[in-house]
C-alpha cells in the first residue's frame, strides 16, 4: 500500500510514482482541486466554523448521522451476519475512505471532500445486500422504483432530522454533487427523490463530478474487490489455489512465495492480497496522473467539463 501522499507532477512511468511537492512547494493538484473557500455553499446559509472547513463539517455530520450508524447492520454480499469477520457497509465505507484519502493526496486533490463522499457513498443502500435492493426496487416500481444513490441524497437532504433550522444535514453543493454523481453523470429520467431536490438546488446532474468524487468511486471499487476476496476465502467460497489461477493474483502469490517461502496459509494469503490491493491503487494513480497531465485542467470546472472521467483504471 502506498504510504506517501503527494506526487511530483507529471507522473513519469520510467521512474514510477514519486512523492513530494512541486518546485514551488505547492501540491500539484492545487489548480483543479475543490477549494473549500470557493465552495458553492449550502442550501441553507450557515455561519462558517472557526476551526473546520466546510468539507470537514460535512464529513463530521455524516459520521454522526443515524444513517451512517445503521450501515453497521447492512452487508454487500452476505445476506446475514455469520460471524464478526465479514465486512458490513460500515466497515466497507471506512476502508473506502482510507483508500480515497491516499489517492486524493497523491493527486493533490482535496482529501477532506474525497473522504466525505467516500463515507457517504453507501448511505442509501437497504439491508440484505444487492438482493435487498432488487427486491425493494420491484416493490417500489409503481412509485418510480428504488435507486440507492437517489436514496442517499434523500437521506442527507431530508430524512435526517436533527437540526433546528433545516431538514437533512445541509451539506455543501460539492458533497451532494459527489454523492449523486460519483459514478458518473446522471442521465435519463431522474428518480423522484433526486429530481425533487435537484429542482431546489441544481446539482448539474448531466455533467461529471469533481475529481474528488471520481476518486471516491474508484476507491469503492478497489475496496470491495479486495475485501470480497478476503471474505470469500474466509467463507470458503473459493480457495487460494483458485485465486492463483487468475494471472494478476498469480503474480501476487508468486512474489510472496519467492520472498517468504515458508509463510503459513493465513499470512501468505494476506500478503498476496495486500500486493493486489497495492497494484489497484497504483494503477489508478498512474492512469489518473496521465489523464490529468494530458488535460492540464486550470480549475475544477475543467474536470467537470472534460467529457470523460479523469480518474480511471487502465
Which residues are covered by each model-predicted region?
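Short active-site segment of divalent metal-dependent hydrolases/proteases
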Residues: 120, 124-128, 223
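Histidine-centered, transition-metal-coordinating active-site segments
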Residues: 8-93, 98-103, 112, 132, ...
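Acidic, glycine-rich active-site loops and adjacent beta-strand->loop/helix elements
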Residues: 119-123, 140, 159
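Leucine-biased recognition of intrinsically disordered, low-complexity hydrophobic segments
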Residues: 2-3
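Post-HEXXH active-site segment of zinc metalloproteases
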Residues: 116, 127-142, 234-238
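Active-site nucleophile and cofactor-binding loops and adjacent substrate-binding regions
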Residues: 143-148
Amino acid at each position: 500500500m502506498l504510504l506517501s501522499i503527494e506526487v511530483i507532477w507529471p507522473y513519469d512511468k520510467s521512474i514510477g510514482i514519486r512523492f513530494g511537492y512541486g518546485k514551488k512547494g505547492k501540491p500539484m493538484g492545487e489548480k483543479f482541486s475543490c477549494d473549500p473557500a470557493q465552495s458553492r455553499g449550502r442550501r441553507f446559509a450557515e455561519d462558517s466554523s472557526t476551526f473546520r472547513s466546510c468539507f470537514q463539517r460535512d464529513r463530521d455530520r455524516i459520521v454522526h448521522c443515524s444513517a451512517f450508524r445503521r450501515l453497521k447492520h447492512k452487508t454487500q454480499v452476505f445476506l446475514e451476519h455469520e460471524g464478526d469477520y465479514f465486512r458490513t457497509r460500515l466497515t466497507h465505507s471506512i476502508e473506502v475512505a482510507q483508500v480515497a484519502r491516499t489517492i486524493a493526496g497523491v493527486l493533490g486533490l482535496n482529501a477532506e471532500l474525497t473522504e466525505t463522499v467516500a463515507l457517504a457513498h453507501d448511505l442509501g443502500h437497504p439491508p440484505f445486500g444487492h438482493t435487498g435492493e432488487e427486491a425493494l426496487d420491484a416493490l417500489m416500481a409503481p412509485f418510480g422504483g428504488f435507486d440507492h444513490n437517489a436514496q442517499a441524497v434523500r437521506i442527507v437532504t431530508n430524512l435526517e432530522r436533527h437540526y433546528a433550522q433545516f431538514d437533512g444535514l445541509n451539506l455543501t453543493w460539492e458533497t451532494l454533487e459527489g454523492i449523486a454523481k460519483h459514478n458518473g453523470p446522471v442521465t435519463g429520467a431522474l428518480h423522484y427523490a433526486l429530481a425533487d431536490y435537484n429542482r431546489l438546488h441544481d446539482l448539474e446532474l448531466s455533467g461529471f463530478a469533481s475529481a474528488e468524487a471520481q476518486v471516491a468511486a474508484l476507491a469503492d471499487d478497489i475496496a470491495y474487490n479486495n475485501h470480497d476476496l478476503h471474505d470469500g476465502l474466509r467463507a470458503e467460497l473459493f480457495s487460494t489455489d483458485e485465486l492463483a489461477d487468475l494471472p494478476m493474483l498469480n503474480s501476487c502469490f508468486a512474489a510472496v512465495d519467492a520472498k517468504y517461502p515458508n509463510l503459513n496459509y493465513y499470512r501468505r494469503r494476506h500478503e498476496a492480497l495486500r500486493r493486489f490491493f497495492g497494484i489497484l491503487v497504483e494503477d489508478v494513480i498512474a492512469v489518473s496522473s496521465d489523464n490529468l497531465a494530458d488535460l492540464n485542467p486550470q480549475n475544477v470546472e475543467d474536470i467537470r467539463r472534460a467529457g470523460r472521467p479523469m480518474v480511471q483504471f487502465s
